[in-house]
Amino acid sequence: MPTSPSIDRETLTTLFDSLGGDPDFLAELLDEYFKDAPAQFQTLHEALITGNAETFRRAAHSMKSNSANFGAMTLSGMCKELEEMGRTGQLDGAAPLIVQAETEYQRGKSALEDALKEI
């Protein structure tokens, strides 16, 4: 598997190994992540608009955890910041960070797709 700035190779390899080295199962899990992430980002945007800090926190937490599971540690860190904003109810300044996280998600998605092709 290739190393990418968006993806922690060791984390992805550990996940792959824990799946018994089954590339099809990894592909299924990644597919679910790729389907879920846009909805989570939409939830973040909507919760920001409505000021619903708890919904915001939950969506950020989900993205943080799921991203970390696949080795997207930069994205996970961004989502951790967003989660903390939701936890404290301080959503000012969240919009640019959401956009940055969406950009990082796209980078990570490309890196994960490339890694999957090589295993």
Each model region followed by its residue ranges:
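Two-component system phosphorelay core
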Residues: M1-I119
